[in-house]
């Protein structure tokens, strides 16, 4: 699973995913990319599930770039615990994704466009947000 090796604070404030992304909105590495159409938190398990779906479909002929990383820890208190007495233990790690961010990029060594599009489609089904598949150079 993806998670930071070390953080400055164990329990940071929750970051907002509202609004548009300021940078990282262009496809740089691959031929096709998966762009977020709405904002949300994406957990490290969801990122890993999308990565596995893409790499299994592409096999050894393709390359996958992951442009998001779960830096933010979300805390949760145990069940049936009274209010107060602290914030709770870090439960999961999430990446803050805003609208317009490029999440994944793929390129196939055999130049099989069908395989690239299918890999991104499979990955999009593993994510909790609406996404759009875009070709390099065609996004605004």
Curated annotation (Swiss-Prot):
One of its GO terms (biological process) is translation. InterPro entries: Ribosomal_uL16, Ribosomal_uL16_bact-type, Ribosomal_uL16_CS, Ribosomal_uL16_dom, Ribosomal_uL16_sf. SUPFAM superfamilies: Ribosomal protein L16p/L10e (SSF54686). One of its GO terms (molecular function) is tRNA binding. The keyword Ribosomal protein applies. Pfam families: Ribosomal_L16. Keywords: Ribonucleoprotein, Ribosomal protein, RNA-binding, rRNA-binding, tRNA-binding. The keyword Transmembrane helix does not apply. GO terms for cellular component: cytosolic large ribosomal subunit. Binds 23S rRNA and is also seen to make contacts with the A and possibly P site tRNAs. Part of the 50S ribosomal subunit. Belongs to the universal ribosomal protein uL16 family. HAMAP family: Ribosomal_uL16. This is Large ribosomal subunit protein uL16. The gene is rplP.
């Amino acid at each position: 699973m993806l998670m930071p090796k070390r953080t400055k604070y164990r329990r940071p404030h929750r970051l907002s995913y509202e609004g548009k992304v300021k940078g990282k909105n262009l496809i740089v590495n691959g031929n096709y990319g998966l762009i977020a159409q709405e904002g949300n938190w994406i957990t490290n398990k969801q990122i890993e599930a999308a990565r596995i779906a893409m790499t299994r479909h592409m096999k050894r002929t393709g390359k996958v770039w992951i442009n998001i990383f779960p830096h933010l820890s979300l805390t949760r208190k145990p069940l049936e615990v009274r209010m107060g007495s602290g914030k709770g233990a870090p439960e999961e790690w999430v990446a803050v994704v805003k609208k317009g961010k490029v999440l994944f990029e793929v390129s196939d060594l055999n130049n099989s466009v069908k395989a690239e599009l299918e890999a991104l489609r499979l990955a999009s089904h593993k994510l909790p947000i609406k996404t759009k598949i875009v070709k390099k150079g065609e996004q605004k």
